[in-house]
A protein has these predicted regions:
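A signal for long, low-complexity, Ser/Thr/Asn-enriched, surface-exposed stalk/shaft
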Residues: 1-31
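Glycine- and small/polar-enriched repetitive beta-structure motifs of secreted/surface proteins
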Residues: 23-377
Length: 377
């Protein structure tokens, strides 16, 4: 033991590679304690940076087996913290990764996986060569293997299928179990608790809102925004559905080419095709009708199976009780509303044809034909 009394220092050993073991407590005071191996690496924990002859520089490995197998050239600038985190670094050019959490990025073994950020228990655990992924949350992106450019934030976000390697690129999943089932699907955006949670191979969809699109598995190209929007879609026939608003299109299973905007817009549609409903409760009773257009609060609001009608204005064709009412055109507040039987009518003006019961009628003007029962021809 050498004591330098002029500075108050205590020196142990004769060279920098001497090993020192302490039994009991070790109390160190002062400004810092350095764990530097001469290459600007810091390794703390059993087997951290465990490979002999490691030549990488400027790495931080903290935890048992952190960077255990690291031995490739240019393995630099990594921050790895946690049991088995980054354990399999064995290739050249594995650099600039941030892995924090038990087994985070444990199987990365290719320089292609550089610039990965995985934070959370098992986050990115199956990544081998997938590059530039950002994964934050317990088991976020767990089954991603070779996929690139994904962002998963939240518990089980983009978790994937334990039996299928995740290879889909360029997905964004934010929220508890958002895109949880993703395997090969690509270029999806899912934001919200359980948004798109069952999607496996679906692609190029935008799903925003808690439980929005949560039954989708393979359906591509949907835009679903709002709580439970498109929540029952489960068939590829419903591809390219647009449903915006709480519960918009919530019952659609296989209905095609729908555009639904507003709270409860088209909420009851199951298999109807090519409907466009814009407005609070617009088309909210329709189930299997097709090629209808409704614009305004509660427009076309009570028709169940009607087809090829146009309703523009609040309550236009709004409380139509004829379930199969078809080929009607109504423009104006309440136009054609409360019609119990009738098809192929034209109602233009506020309350035009209101309470009318006939078919093939044309009523133009405020309250024109209100309460009428005439049919023509």
């Amino acid at each position: 033991i050498s004591i330098a009394t002029n500075s108050g220092s205590v020196n142990f050993g004769d060279s920098g590679d001497d090993i020192h073991r302490f039994t009991g407590s070790l109390d160190i005071s002062g400004s810092r304690i350095s764990f530097d191996d001469g290459k600007q690496n810091i390794a703390i924990g059993t087997n951290s940076i465990g490979a002999s002859g490691f030549t990488g520089t400027t790495n931080i490995a903290i935890g048992e087996n952190a960077m255990l197998d690291a031995n490739g050239a240019n393995t630099n600038y990594n921050i790895v913290i946690g049991y088995n985190a980054g354990k399999s670094f064995g290739a050249n050019n594995v650099y600039s990764n941030i892995l924090i959490g038990r087994q985070a990025g444990m199987n990365i073994n290719s320089g292609d996986a550089s610039n990965t950020i995985a934070i959370g228990t098992n986050a990115g655990i199956d990544i081998t060569s997938g590059q530039r992924n950002l994964l934050i949350g317990t088991e976020a992106g767990t089954n991603i293997s070779t996929a690139d450019y994904n962002v998963a934030i939240g518990y089980h976000a983009m978790h994937g299928d334990d039996s299928t390697a995740g290879t889909g690129n360029s997905n964004i999943a934010v929220g508890y179990e958002a895109l949880k089932g993703a395997t090969t699907g690509y270029e999806n955006v899912a934001i919200g608790n359980s948004a798109g949670t069952s999607a496996t191979t679906a692609y190029r969809s935008v799903i925003i809102g808690a439980s929005a699109g949560d039954a989708i598995t393979t359906t591509p190209g949907v835009v679903l925004i709002g709580y439970n929007a498109g929540g029952a879609i489960n068939h590829d026939d419903a591809a390219y559905t647009v449903a915006i608003g709480q519960n918009a299109g919530a019952a659609i299973t296989s209905g095609r080419y729908q555009t639904l905007v507003g709270y409860n817009a088209g909420v009851s549609i199951t298999e109807g095709d090519s409907n466009t409903f814009i407005g609070h409760n617009s088309g909210d009773a329709l189930t299997t009708g097709l090629e209808n257009t409704a614009l305004g609060y509660s427009s076309l609001g009570a028709n169940i199976t009607g087809q090829r009608s146009v309703a523009i204005g609040n309550n236009a064709l709004g409380t139509n009780l004829a379930s199969g009412w078809t080929y009607n055109t109504a423009v104006g507040w309440g136009a054609g509303s409360n019609n119990t039987v009738g098809s192929s009518g034209t109602f233009i003006g506020s309350k035009a044809g209101y309470n009318a019961t006939g078919s093939y009628n044309t009523f133009v003007g405020t309250s024109a034909g209100e309460g009428g029962t005439t049919s023509a021809p």
